[in-house]
């Protein structure tokens, strides 16, 4: 099965040469997702919970556009700028993964825009869309 580009309706053009997601062999690969509005500006500056919610809603949109759901997520790569935000980010993260949790890692690092506090990339196994 060839690779399929996944771009949810209303998605802005990324600021670099990539797409929001790709689907190949029943697996959705979601690009690193930042708390950006449609003009690629950081939203909810200073609020790690709101930024995390925005990021996960964006990821959810990509996965649902591909025919899956957040329950299909098997792995998340999480990048945060400050460990003091870790608990707040986890609180919102748990809302999106209430059942069995996906595997993940979380590292502290700098992000592409200074006001961004969190970035998440995801992998979801959705099987063959019907």
UniProtKB/Swiss-Prot annotation:
Q: Which GO CC annotations does the UniProt entry carry?
A: cytosol
The record's annotation in SUPFAM superfamilies points to:
YjgF-like (SSF55298)
Q: Which InterPro entries match?
A: RidA_CS, RutC, RutC-like_sf, YjgF/YER057c/UK114
Which EC numbers characterise this protein's activity in its record? 3.5.-.-
Keywords in alphabetical order, please. Hydrolase
Recorded catalytic activity of this chain's protein: (Z)-3-aminoacrylate + H2O + H(+) = 3-oxopropanoate + NH4(+)
Instruction: Determine the domain of life of the protein's source.
Output: Bacteria
Which Pfam families does UniProt cross-reference here? Ribonuc_L-PSP (PF01042)
Q: Gene3D superfamilies, per this entry?
A: RutC-like
GO biological process terms, alphabetically, are:
nitrogen utilization; uracil catabolic process
Top EC category: hydrolase
MF terms from GO for this chain are: deaminase activity
Q: Does the keyword Cell wall biogenesis/degradation apply?
A: no
Protein task = Involved in pyrimidine catabolism. Catalyzes the deamination of 3-aminoacrylate to malonic semialdehyde, a reaction that can also occur spontaneously. RutC may facilitate the reaction and modulate the metabolic fitness, rather than catalyzing essential functions.
Can you tell me which family this protein belongs to? Answer: Belongs to the RutC family.
Its recorded name reads 3-aminoacrylate deaminase RutC
- List the source organism: Klebsiella variicola (strain At-22)
